[in-house]
């Protein structure tokens, strides 16, 4: 199954919850008036798009309708697709243009951080990259063992210390090992704690310092892993993490198990952070680059 087919199948619940409701609104009106926009905005809000983004989409739609002279509600779907694709367009590429590139993976426990690292390591190795993984989430019981299982499956090296060790020390060793082994990419797991923001911030700053001091020429990608099934809560998490880290991209997991896949839209619209990768299944090769146009086509097809 190609990725577009996987995406389409993964977005089925979201399509049923969001796109079909939008179609329902469109089909129930014979003209585009204020009632139409109100109904559409309410539908978007109820589909986890959030009040701010829903209002912005409807405002953009009003302008498009006026500019194009559209009077038939049936033509609105095409305009909506264009508006949503425009919102999602951004720097969706994962940059691996330095050797090594360092990827810091952050996110709360349970969002799918460890799984994402395993799948990303597998993807990169499959494309010919040499990968080293740093098990720097040293606080959560079993995090290191879990990551070991995934790196074994992906066939990549792991650098680990004992549970409770200093995460920055693990990252330091991983950078040194990565350079010695001529690695293309070093992926660093981090502790998934948000309840103590100061600790998290201090820890991420310390890790960033280690990276900057020991791999000064490396590009650093900081990826925030969010669970699509949590809906608006994912936007709130992203907002909090944005205050503590310089996030370069989002990885949205569990897109296949939720009707809340529309959450991608407010994350980009309200926070300005591009989605770079999406998880659409449980298999090791089910983490794929996010292509906005494919997402919109799969949603509204």
Model-derived segments and their meaning:
Residues 1-25:
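Charged, compositionally biased N-terminal leader segments and the immediate start
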Residues 11, 48-50, 108, 137, ...:
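Residue-level signature of catalytic and energy-coupling elements of molecular machines
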Residues 17-136, 143-164, 169-188:
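Primarily NTPase-proximal linker/entry elements flanking Walker-type ATP/GTP-binding cores
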Residues 34, 55, 70, 74, ...:
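Non-catalytic, surface-exposed connector residues within folded enzymatic/regulatory domains
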Residues 51-53, 140, 256, 284:
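Short hydrophobic/aromatic residue motifs in ordered secondary structure
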Residues 136-139, 163, 229, 255:
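Structured loop/turn residues at secondary-structure junctions
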Residues 146, 167-181, 195-301:
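Conserved catalytic-core segment of NTP-binding enzymes
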Residues 191-193:
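Short glycine-rich anion-binding loops that position phosphate/pyrophosphate groups of nucleotides
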């Amino acid at each position: 199954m190609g990725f577009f087919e996987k995406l389409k199948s993964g977005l089925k619940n979201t399509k049923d919850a969001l796109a079909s409701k939008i179609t329902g609104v469109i089909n129930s009106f014979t003209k585009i008036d204020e009632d139409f926009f109100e109904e559409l905005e309410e539908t978007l809000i109820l589909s986890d798009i959030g009040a701010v983004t829903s209002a912005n989409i409807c405002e953009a739609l009003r302008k498009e309708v006026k500019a194009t002279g559209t009077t038939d509600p049936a033509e609105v779907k095409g305009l909506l697709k264009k508006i949503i694709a425009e919102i999602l367009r951004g720097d969706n590429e994962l940059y691996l243009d330095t050797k090594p590139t360092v990827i810091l993976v952050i996110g709360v426990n349970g969002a799918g951080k460890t799984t994402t690292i395993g799948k990303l390591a597998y993807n990169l190795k499959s494309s010919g990259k040499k990968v080293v993984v740093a098990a720097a989430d040293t606080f959560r019981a079993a995090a290191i063992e879990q990551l070991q299982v995934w790196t074994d499956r992906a066939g990549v090296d792991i650098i680990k210390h004992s549970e409770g060790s200093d995460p920055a020390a693990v990252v330091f060793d991983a950078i040194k090992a990565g350079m010695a082994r001529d690695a293309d990419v070093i992926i660093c797991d981090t502790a998934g704690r948000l309840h103590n923001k100061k600790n998290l911030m201090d820890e991420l700053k310390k890790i960033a310092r280690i990276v900057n001091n020991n791999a000064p020429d490396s590009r650093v990608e900081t990826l925030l892993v969010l669970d699509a099934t949590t809906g608006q809560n994912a936007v709130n998490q992203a907002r909090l993490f944005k205050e503590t880290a310089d996030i370069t991209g989002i990885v949205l997991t569990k897109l296949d198990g939720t009707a809340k896949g529309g959450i991608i839209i407010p994350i980009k619209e309200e926070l300005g952070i591009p989605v770079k990768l999406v998880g659409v299944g449980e298999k090791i090769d089910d983490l794929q680059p996010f292509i906005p146009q494919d997402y919109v086509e799969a949603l509204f097809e």
